[in-house]
C-alpha cells in the first residue's frame, strides 16, 4: 500500500528505522537527520516508480549494485542534478547500506563499488586585507574584549567554529617568543596543535588576564557563562560583518582567510596539518590560482 507521501509503507518504515538508529547511535542535529531522511526517500521513490518494479514496494534485498548505478546515472542525465547533490545522496545511501549490513538486514553492501561523480572544486571567496581590517575595526569599535579576541584567534589560527567554542583556558600555552593552542574537538575528534603568532599571543594574554580563573571555557557565553554555542558564535561574527558592511562572507570565511594567507608561504603538508585536513586535496583549494592570477601570469609573456 502506498502512502500519501508517494512511497510505500515499507519504504516509510525503512526510513524511520534508519533515522531512529542514527538518533540513538550518533549525536546528529535535526537538520542532518532531515537531510538523511529526504535523500533516502528520494532513492526509494525512484526505486518504486522509475526503476519499474512490478509490485512497487521497496525491499532492501532487491537493491543490487547495478540498481544504485542506474540511480546515479538517472540523477545525472534525466534529473540533471548538480554533482554535489548527487554525491550527497550517494553518500547517504552508502551510510544506509553500511548500517543495514551491521544490523544483519543484508549480507553485502551493494553501494560499496559505486563511485561518486567528479566534482569541480571551487575555491572559496577570498577575504581581502581591507575587509579583514574593517571587520577587526568593527569589533574594536563596538565589541567586547572577548569578541575582539575571538576574531583575532580565528583569523590567525584558522579554527572551525566548533573548535573555537570548545577551547578551554588550559588549551593555551604561551611562552616569551612562541605559543600554541591544542584543538581537542576537531573533525573525527582528531587532536592537533596550532602555533600562535605574536598578534594572537598578545591578544590572548590581554584577554586571559581578565578571564575568571575558574572558567571552564576560553570563550564562555557572556549571558550564562556556559559554552558558547556555534550558532551564537556565527551570529556574533555576522553582527560585525554587518557593522563593517561586508557582504557575501560568513564565519567560515575567517578560516578560509587564514588558509589563503598561509598558503602563500607555507608548504602544503604543513598547512594541512595546522588546519586539520585529512586530505591534501582539501588544502589545495587555497593554492589554486584565481582568474586574476592567471591573467597576470600570461600577460608577462605578451609581445609589447
Segments and roles (model prediction):
Residues 1-304:
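Conserved catalytic core of the tyrosine transesterase superfamily
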Amino acid at each position: 500500500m502506498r502512502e500519501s507521501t508517494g512511497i510505500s509503507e515499507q519504504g516509510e518504515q525503512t526510513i524511520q528505522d534508519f533515522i531512529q538508529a542514527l538518533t540513538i547511535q550518533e549525536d546528529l542535529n535535526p537538520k542532518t537527520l532531515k537531510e538523511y531522511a529526504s535523500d533516502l526517500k528520494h532513492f526509494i521513490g525512484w526505486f518504486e516508480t522509475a526503476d519499474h518494479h512490478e509490485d512497487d514496494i521497496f525491499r532492501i534485498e532487491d537493491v543490487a549494485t547495478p540498481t544504485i548505478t542506474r540511480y546515479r546515472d538517472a540523477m545525472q542525465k534525466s534529473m540533471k542534478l548538480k554533482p554535489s547533490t548527487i554525491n550527497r545522496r550517494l553518500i547517504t545511501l552508502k551510510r544506509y547500506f553500511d548500517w543495514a549490513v551491521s544490523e544483519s538486514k543484508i549480507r553485502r553492501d551493494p553501494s560499496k563499488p559505486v563511485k561518486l561523480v567528479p566534482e569541480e572544486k571551487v575555491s572559496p571567496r577570498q577575504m581581502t586585507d581591507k575587509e579583514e581590517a574593517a571587520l577587526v575595526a568593527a569589533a574594536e569599535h563596538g565589541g567586547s574584549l572577548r569578541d575582539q579576541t575571538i576574531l583575532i584567534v580565528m583569523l590567525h589560527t584558522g579554527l572551525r567554529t566548533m573548535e573555537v567554542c570548545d577551547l578551554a583556558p588550559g588549551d593555551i600555552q604561551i611562552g616569551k617568543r612562541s605559543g600554541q593552542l591544542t584543538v581537542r574537538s576537531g573533525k573525527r575528534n582528531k587532536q592537533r596543535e596550532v602555533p600562535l603568532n605574536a598578534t594572537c599571543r598578545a591578544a590572548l594574554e590581554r584577554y586571559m588576564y581578565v578571564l575568571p580563573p575558574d572558567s571552564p571555557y576560553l570563550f564562555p557565553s557572556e549571558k550564562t557563562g556556559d559554552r558558547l554555542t556555534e550558532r551564537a558564535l556565527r551570529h556574533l561574527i555576522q553582527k560585525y560583518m554587518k557593522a563593517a558592511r561586508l557582504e557575501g562572507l560568513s564565519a567560515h570565511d575567517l578560516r578560509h582567510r587564514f588558509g589563503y594567507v598561509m598558503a602563500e608561504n607555507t608548504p602544503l603538508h604543513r598547512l594541512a596539518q595546522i588546519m586539520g585536513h585529512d586530505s591534501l586535496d582539501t588544502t589545495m583549494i587555497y593554492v589554486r590560482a584565481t582568474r586574476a592570477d592567471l591573467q597576470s601570469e600570461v600577460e608577462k609573456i605578451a609581445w609589447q
